[in-house]
Amino acid sequence: MLLFKLIVCFFFIFAIGANENKKDETSGENEPSENADVNSEASVVKEAFKKPASRKVNVKPPAAKPPAASKITKPQVPPQKKPPAPKQTTTKKPLLANIEGKIKGAANETTKYLTNLAKEMGKEAESALKEKAKEALTGLLDKADINGAFNAIASIWKNNENKPARYWKCAVENLSEETLVALGTTPYSGNVKTVLSDIPPQSTGVFVWESDSALTGAAGVVHYQLGDKILNIMASDPYDWTLYGAWANVRVSDNKETFDNLYSGKNGAQYPTKAGNWGIADGVKFFLTNNKEAEFQVIFSG
């Protein structure tokens, strides 16, 4: 029995030794794999560390920076910085207003000055024209001269080729002691085309009445005032003598006479003369001196 126990112990010890050797061999064989595992794990770790770096590159610049742009778009200029401008304008307003007022005042004064100057020049030109026209149209102022009056009007009137189809010239002799003051005209067809001027005593005035066109006559009334009376001179150079024969009429009355009264002999006016016959009305002689030139003469004795 004892021997059997010894044999069993021997085999048990031998088995333990064999197992230890096997463990050593297996452990030696397994070491490279462990190292490989360690290396693989290290590469994995490296790859893991590399990936975040690549992510950093791929990641766009901080997208959270738009707030900075929004800060720029937001009113950076504080509204509090604008008050200085209103302060300057408020302080300069009175000065600017004064300057503008002075400029406007100067402009108004200049405009008034130029306007008055133009008026004065116009008055001077008008008065000079009237004086020249008066000298030409009244003929000789020292004595009544029909020929001188007609010559004067011919020198300033149109040339024969430019004369209208119908017209009449009238020379008015003032044999009274008072001036015949020109009061204007009452047109019927056409109008006076020359200056109608006053006629001093013992002087002769002359004017020309023209038609408006070749298809109308020259007809109307010219008025002169002498004291409280009015000398009304009517003449009509008709477009067609066969249809309209009345030519001239004169009347001294208290008012301006109409063309119809003098042409038709109404309301106290006598019937007009025809074809240059002599006529006397209220002490005034009137007649056609030249039918071809339509020269009409009025002699006013007062």
From Swiss-Prot:
Subunit structure of this chain's protein: Octamer or nonamer in membranes. Monomer in the soluble state. In vitro, interacts with folate receptor alpha (of target organism).
Leader sequence residues: 1-17
Motif interval(s): Cell attachment site: 274-276
Function text: Pore-forming protein that forms hydrophilic pores and causes cytolysis. Compared to equinatoxin-2 (AC P61914), it reveals lower cytolysis activity (5-12-fold difference, tested on erythrocytes), a larger pore size (probably 2-3 nm) and different affinity to membrane lipids (100-fold lower affinity to sphingomyelin). Binds to sulfatides. Shows cytolytic activity on HeLa cells, with a different potency than its paralogs (from most potent to less potent: HALT-4>HALT-6~HALT-1>HALT-3>HALT-7>HALT-2).
Keywords: Cytolysis, Membrane, Nematocyst, Secreted, Signal, Target cell membrane, Target membrane, Toxin, Transmembrane
Transmembrane feature ranges: none
Low complexity: compositionally biased ranges: 60-75
Location of this chain's protein in the cell: Nematocyst; Secreted; Target cell membrane
MF (Gene Ontology): channel activity; toxin activity
GO biological process: cytolysis in another organism; monoatomic cation transport; pore complex assembly
One GO cellular component, as annotated: pore complex
Full protein name: Hydra actinoporin-like toxin 4
Predominant cellular place of this UniProt entry's protein: other
Record text about domains: Composed of a long N-terminal alpha-helix and a core region rich in beta-sheet structures. Before the pore formation, the alpha-helix binds the lipid membrane, partitions into the lipid-water interface and stabilizes the monomeric molecule on the membrane. Finally, it traverses the bilayer, thus forming the transmembrane pore.
Residue ranges of the region described as Disordered: 22-93
Homology family: Belongs to the actinoporin family. HALT subfamily.
Biased composition (Pro residues): 76-86
Pfam families attached to this UniProt entry: Anemone_cytotox (PF06369)
